[in-house]
Regions:
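Small-residue-rich transmembrane alpha-helices that serve as helix-helix interface/gating elements
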Residues: 142-150
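Cytosolic juxtamembrane helix at the C-terminal end of the final transmembrane segment
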Residues: 2-4, 86-96, 121-125, 149-177
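Interfacial non-cytosolic loop connecting adjacent transmembrane helices
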Residues: 33-67, 114-143
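Membrane-water interface of alpha-helical transmembrane segments
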Residues: 1-12, 60-71, 90-100, 132-142
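Cytosolic juxtamembrane helix and N-cap/initiation of the first transmembrane helix
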Residues: 1-38, 155-166, 177
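Hydrophobic alpha-helical transmembrane segments
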Residues: 69-85
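Hydrophobic alpha-helical transmembrane segments of integral membrane proteins
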Residues: 91-127
């Protein structure tokens, strides 16, 4: 390809930032319930039951983010981002696109896994209003991120289609000449 795929550079930089934050998240230690309770107790806006529910919810979500499956997803996604960068630097846009598509599909799998874990954590909340709010927030966040990933996927597929179409037109023009 003659053109520099700026769309892919932008998507990969955003993905690299997300992957690095996820890597730092799994490298940080799992907080204890006492530490969570102490940090939330200073807010003063929660009742004793809400405080305990929030501690249990936060601990369960943190625990699931440190699971082996989640760690494998994060490490694999970081590797895919690095590989896509390498392909892009070497001007192999097609393989960079394929690698990025793999990354996005893996990210969607990670979002579904995260959503299922958050729904399990919401079951620990006894306060119905708090549980409803946290469940709705988790659902909304996951839906938003899945939509963003699908849009990224659509953009990459569109660009791949355009690149193939341009390449076909170039070959036809050369054959006609």
């Amino acid at each position: 390809m003659k053109k520099n795929p700026i769309y892919l550079w932008v998507l990969l930089v955003l993905s690299a930032l997300i992957s690095s934050m996820s890597l730092f998240g799994i490298l940080s230690p799992l907080p204890s319930k006492d530490a969570l309770r102490a940090s939330l107790a200073n807010s003063g806006a929660l009742t004793a039951q809400q405080l305990e529910d929030t501690v249990n919810y936060t601990y369960k979500v943190s625990e699931s983010s440190h699971s082996i499956f989640n760690m494998l997803l994060i490490i694999l996604s970081a590797i895919l981002v690095v590989v896509a960068f390498v392909f892009l630097v070497r001007k192999n846009v097609q393989f960079a696109n394929y690698t990025y598509v793999g990354y996005v599909l893996l990210a969607i799998v990670g979002l579904v896994y995260s959503y299922m874990n958050v729904q399990d954590a919401v079951q620990l909340i006894k306060d119905s209003a708090l549980g409803l709010g946290m469940g709705a927030l988790a659902k909304g966040t996951n839906i938003l991120f899945i939509i963003i990933n699908v849009l990224f996927l659509a953009l990459v597929f569109y660009k791949m289609w355009r690149q193939q179409k341009d390449l076909t037109e170039e070959v036809e023009a050369e054959e006609a000449a």
